[in-house]
């Protein structure tokens, strides 16, 4: 157990400060003494311990482990400093990093830093420095793009070059970049090229044709909007395809105006097309991409300006030159704005023509008239003048007002027989009178008694001017009355509006009226205020913004779930009402299909069948006394002049 351990060494080997040395404990096994070279002596009493270390570092007395740790720490610190010097940017270059590496939008939100350099690229495509000298680049650095010379560090930018296929200097063409690592940079560059593509095509178009593309077209924001006329400009078309498109496009179009030019990208085909049917932008894009064999993003597709004289003159003038090929009939919007004859025919807007249009089409709503008349601008000169006017709202309001006046006067001078004939002439279908008779029999109503009451009702005989249809719910009371009201063009009044002074105003513009679903409160109101209305005598009706109107109340139909003849509180209404009871549920042949259909055609046939029984004037008598249904004309006719 007491074998001698350790390594023999001289004192000179252990005292050299510049090299490695061995310090070992020398133990005398007999006396168990520790060598004086050892730092700690457990047998010492502590009286001669020196608490202040006055040793000079590096005198050769350090512990080897501590020295080794210091050397490792120094090496790590040197390595970290080298990395920081290489990768960490200084405060002076922080602005350049943000401009080149990040989006300009991120730099725009900074409050302290203002950059004066022009920003044309969002990402720097330079790969990370490998540390082995300069790296040859294929894409220009941001210093080259912005036009600034490399003034930081005093080193010029070397070995940087850019290769493009088209020579136009834009980002839409293919850019060859070295395989420097990630796919993210490549996808971002593809996105940038796509965003700049349209601007590049517009610039090239103006350079080739000498006119802006949007000066000839109007923009459709939606690609689903259909139009028959389209302006297409395709870039990068092969020569053989550009020559063959003149024949390939003919089966799809009625008119084509084609121009073909040559540029550094290839052939450019510029076309004005009128398709056989209306198409949207997506359909046109797919069609032209298939015919021209080019990507859809290499085309500009918009509809032409239809009311622009300069645009029409451009198409007219270029069609006369030898640089264009045209086939088909020239569109009317070009002819209208270019030919002398059509220019002389342009006239100012005439309100009477618009009023006649509203009268002929029975339009009494301003919004409907404005929409319908504006659609005639391509075929009607007065409608085109209406669209060119700055007073469209005033014209529409005046035309509807005049149409209502004419309609009201025409209705007032017609008798009930003439009015039924007038309304029946508007129905072109052939109907059957039997469903009406069968429905009345289904409800237990005698047809003869109904005809007798209906004859007095149409004549407006006093005390017989109101018919009440009484019965439980879902028996067809409203269905029967509404169908008759629609055929005769009547008006509906509602007790819900009885708080207004003008709730009876619709009766002044109709030949027949309907009060649907009268409640006990409604019958009490009628018994209090509207007895003369049920009599058929002249009454005074208040109208909004107008003076009181005195007129004879038109025949009035009332539907109700309450029998007013059985209530003693309404005993004064019994002599003024003619009551018919509907007790049976409304019959259906199938869900949603009535067993006895009652429509305008059936009512027309019913009146024709029972014309004599209702004691209506025959059409022959009307012709003898003068036909009051002569078409109204507020526009003077054209005089035919012989040559």
UniProtKB/Swiss-Prot annotation:
Cross-link position per record: Glycyl lysine isopeptide (Lys-Gly) (interchain with G-Cter in SUMO): 552
Residue ranges annotated as motif Nuclear export signal: 102-111
Q: What family does this belong to?
A: Belongs to the papillomaviridae E1 protein family.
Question: How would you summarize the oligomeric state and partners of this protein?
Answer: Can form hexamers. Interacts with E2 protein; this interaction increases E1 DNA binding specificity. Interacts with host DNA polymerase subunit POLA2. Interacts with host single stranded DNA-binding protein RPA1. Interacts with host TOP1; this interaction stimulates the enzymatic activity of TOP1.
Q: Record's Gene Ontology CC terms?
A: host cell nucleus
Q: Where does this polypeptide localize? A: Host nucleus
What is this protein's function per UniProt?
ATP-dependent DNA 3'-5' helicase required for initiation of viral DNA replication. It forms a complex with the viral E2 protein. The E1-E2 complex binds to the replication origin which contains binding sites for both proteins. During the initial step, a dimer of E1 interacts with a dimer of protein E2 leading to a complex that binds the viral origin of replication with high specificity. Then, a second dimer of E1 displaces the E2 dimer in an ATP-dependent manner to form the E1 tetramer.
Q: Where is the SF3 helicase domain?
A: 445-595
GO biological process assignments? DNA replication
**What is this protein's name?**
Replication protein E1
Q: Which SUPFAM superfamilies match?
A: Origin of replication-binding domain, RBD-like, P-loop containing nucleoside triphosphate hydrolases
Which GO molecular function, any one, fits this protein according to its record? DNA binding
Basic and acidic residues bias locations: 155-167
Motif stretch (Nuclear localization signal): 84-86
**Residue numbers spanned by region DNA-binding region:** 180-346
Annotated ATP binding lies at 471-478
